[in-house]
Swiss-Prot record:
Keyword set includes Cell inner membrane: no
Subcellular location: Cytoplasm
GO-annotated molecular function: protein folding chaperone; unfolded protein binding
PTM summary: Under oxidizing conditions two disulfide bonds are formed involving the reactive cysteines. Under reducing conditions zinc is bound to the reactive cysteines and the protein is inactive.
Keyword entries, A-Z: Chaperone, Cytoplasm, Disulfide bond, Redox-active center, Zinc
Protein name per its UniProtKB record: 33 kDa chaperonin
Gene3D superfamilies: Hsp33 domain (3.55.30.10), HSP33 redox switch-like (3.90.1280.10)
Top-rank lineage group of the source organism: Bacteria
Main location: cytoplasm
Disulfide-bonded cysteines: C230-C232, C263-C266
Species, as recorded: Trichlorobacter lovleyi (strain ATCC BAA-1151 / DSM 17278 / SZ) (Geobacter lovleyi)
Organism classification: Bacteria, Pseudomonadati, Thermodesulfobacteriota, Desulfuromonadia, Geobacterales
Amino acid sequence: MHDHIARAMAVKGKIRAVACVTTNLANDICFLQGTSPIASIALGRALSGAALVGSTLKQGQRTAIKFEGGGPLKKLIAEVEWDGAIRGTVAVPDAVAESVPAALGRAGFLTVTRDLGMKDPYTGMVQLYTSEIAEDLAYYLTDSEQIPSAMGLGVSLADDGQIAVSGGFLIQSLPPSDEAAVDQIMTTISKLPPLTTLLKDGTTPQQLLDILLEGVEHHPLESTNLFFRCGCSRDKVERALLSLGKAGLERMIEEQGEAAVTCEFCKQQYRFERSELEALSRSY
């Protein structure tokens, strides 16, 4: 099944529902990151979570989620762009833990940044609620963005350590709320088989939405393909080096003679010889 996100509206626009499959891009990203089993599960969930949280993006917009905690993973980042491009990284990819909450740590913060093309991006932050990625994202959406939300995320690993399935769903109640419909959907969610079981059985995102919204009037909206794309470039790295200032560049030239910058997302390395650093320094 190709990676994509499906959308639906229910009860005359009072309920928004989205579901996604991210198996292939999660495997690509985890391979680049060199993740341990628990890091693969955590990162896979975060990638799906970012896709769901960013499901309403318009052209040129971007959403990023960042989990920071005291556990062995330290930091987890997933970003999605309006066209379905996703990337992610984990600070300690070889972390070992018995569960995702243990890997993240009970104390920490979730930061959500929405770049909507305005002068400054909007950033919201909450303390980690349970350190379960789906629950923390739903808590953030409900508490900070004032949109009652329910989210489910699932990742299952194959015997060889690769991701067998990865995906999730997000249900949001929009004003004016239809409490009867919300209660019915929450009852359906409570009786839902494990999400990874549904995904292993080949359930598509649209079929998952039909299951979640059974008995509730709903209609499908557009779907979007999801895929891995980093977006880093030599020009962006040059701008980052220029941000060091003339003094910072001269110090780098004196102490190191060259620069090697590795993208934390795709691991592409960009090298700058002394002459290139000197040219950047002279641009001030």
